[in-house]
Each structure stands twice: as structure tokens, then as C-alpha cells.
């Protein structure tokens, strides 16, 4: 939590679901309600109560639906669920505000390709439900975001949602990053002086590398399609795929480091492995900050 001096009022705004009832300015709300002839509420935001903000940007492209439960590889939806739950729990433990953004389809007619944006908010009251459960429910949407969904998401945060995200906001971008973002997208996001954290979710066998399946007739599924096709790779093709995948990951992590971003690599959907990866990132971050002091 970032605290200002004293408890001076920093600003006021209309009430939104999720705001604490204690933050309502009842006198100002009464005046506004009387003037407009209906119930309207004003919320006070104080310097001393300015909480840290965490935003989760979740990639919902078809490749993020891999791999099915019956296969012995990384189940990305489950890994993303564990990542999301740990980040939300950590933010709430620090009394932070949590926001969410993706470009997939959702219930109630929300179409793929349009921002599904939930501004940062605190833990909901008991009768409104648990914020952790609500965020996890967002992950039940479709895996049908466009290929440039992450670029659109970062552009949305830098424009339409910018007013909700002060300097120092943590923005966790969760994706397999197999569809690269343009340097300009990262540059515009970095200009906002947010704390950007890429979380790379890739299967260690099929995406970080490639298995030795030369000569074996192998069924492969195309992301976003229910059908599978049978393919057979020779030794040269296997080696080319392996080198290409390894180079892609190495290049991705190198690019992130060049931008000053500490990426997290997730290659397992086991809760303990996910927790260990995030804990290692947090410890490394604390160590790096200690060196700068």
C-alpha cells in the first residue's frame, strides 16, 4: 500500500460496485441525489488509503487452450488459473486493488476482440461474493481472442484505462507469447511507468523444445480446432523444429531482459511448480532492488 501524508482527500468519483461502503461521502451523495432526483453515491479517495494496483492481462488466443487433460503435457488453462489465483491472493493479502483484462468472448454477449475490462477494485463485501472467485470465473470465457489480442490489450490500458492505473501499477501479462508483440507495443506500455511482468506459459516439450519423434506418425491438434491431423517428421525436421523453438524462447527472454523486464517462465501446471516459479521471481526481484539501495 502506498501511503500519502495524513488522510487528506485525494479525489472523489461516482460509486462503483466493489467500493467499500465506508468510502462513501454521504453528504455529497445526498446533495447529488437531491439535484438529480435519484440515488447517486460519491466515493472519497484519500492519500492515506491509496492502495497498490495489480492488473492481470490474460491471453485468450486459441493456443492458450492447449493441452487437453488426457495428454501428458502442460495444461495451459490450469497453469493460468493457478498463476491468476496466486497473484490475486497476494494482492489482496497486501490490501491491493485487482483489475482484469482480456480480449476473449464472455457470457452476456461480450464478443471476442473487444476488451473485457474490469477496473482495479478491492475485496468485495460478503454479500457480493469473493474477488478471487470472480476473477477465476473470468477465465471461463472463450479461447477466441485475435492474434494481436495482447497488442490491443496493452494499447487499451495505455489509453482508455489509463486513468485507473497510476505510476507503479503492476501489470502481469500472462501468455505463451508464441505470437510476438511489436516493440512499439512494449514501448508505449513502458512509457506509462507501470511495473510490467511478462509470465511466459509454454510447454517444455512442444514449445520450449521439440520431442524426438522422427519417423513416428503423430496426431497434432491445431489451436482453435477440434480436429487433429497425422504428421510424420524426419530427423532433420525434428532438429529444425527443436532449434527454432529454443531460439524463439531464448530470443523472447533476451528481449524482455533488454527492456528491463523480469519475466517468469511457467512450464508446468502443477500448483507447487507454479508457486515455486513465482516465488523465485519475487525473491530475485527483492534481491535486485536491495542491490540498488
Regions found by a protein language model. Name each.
Residues 10-11:
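Short domain-edge segments at the starts or junctions of modular domains/repeats
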Residues 1-4, 14-22, 28-35, 43-47, ...:
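Exposed, interaction-prone extracellular/peripheral surfaces
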Amino acid at each position: 500500500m502506498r501511503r500519502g501524508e495524513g488522510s487528506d482527500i485525494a479525489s472523489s468519483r461516482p460509486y462503483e460496485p466493489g467500493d467499500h461502503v465506508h468510502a462513501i461521502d454521504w453528504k455529497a451523495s445526498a446533495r447529488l441525489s437531491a439535484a438529480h432526483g435519484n440515488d447517486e453515491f460519491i466515493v472519497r479517495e484519500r492519500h492515506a488509503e491509496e492502495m497498490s494496483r495489480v492488473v492481470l492481462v490474460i491471453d485468450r488466443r486459441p493456443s492458450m487452450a492447449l493441452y487437453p487433460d488426457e495428454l501428458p503435457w502442460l495444461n495451459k488453462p490450469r497453469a493460468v488459473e493457478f498463476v491468476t489465483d496466486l497473484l490475486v491472493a497476494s494482492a489482496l493479502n497486501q490490501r491491493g486493488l485487482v483489475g482484469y483484462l482480456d480480449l476473449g468472448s464472455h457470457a452476456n454477449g461480450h464478443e471476442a476482440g473487444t476488451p473485457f475490462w474490469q477496473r482495479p477494485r478491492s475485496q468485495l463485501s460478503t454479500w457480493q461474493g469473493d474477488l478471487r472467485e470472480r476473477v477465476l470465473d473470468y477465465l471461463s470465457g472463450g479461447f477466441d481472442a485475435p492474434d494481436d489480442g495482447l497488442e490491443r490489450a496493452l494499447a487499451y490500458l495505455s489509453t482508455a484505462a489509463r486513468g485507473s492505473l497510476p505510476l507503479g501499477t503492476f501489470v502481469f501479462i500472462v501468455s505463451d507469447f508464441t505470437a510476438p508483440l511489436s516493440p512499439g507495443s512494449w514501448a508505449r506500455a513502458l512509457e506509462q511507468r507501470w511495473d510490467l511482468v511478462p509470465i511466459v506459459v509454454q510447454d517444455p516439450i512442444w514449445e520450449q523444445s521439440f520431442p524426438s519423434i522422427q519417423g513416428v506418425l503423430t496426431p497434432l491438434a491445431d489451436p482453435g480446432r477440434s480436429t487433429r491431423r497425422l504428421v510424420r517428421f524426419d530427423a532433420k525436421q525434428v532438429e529444425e523444429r527443436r532449434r527454432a523453438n529454443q531460439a524463439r524462447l531464448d530470443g523472447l527472454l533476451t528481449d524482455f531482459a533488454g527492456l528491463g523486464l523480469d519475466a517468469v517462465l511457467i512450464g508446468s501446471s502443477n500448483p507447487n511448480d507454479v508457486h515455486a516459479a513465482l516465488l523465485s521471481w519475487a525473491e530475485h526481484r527483492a534481491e535486485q532492488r536491495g542491490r540498488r539501495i
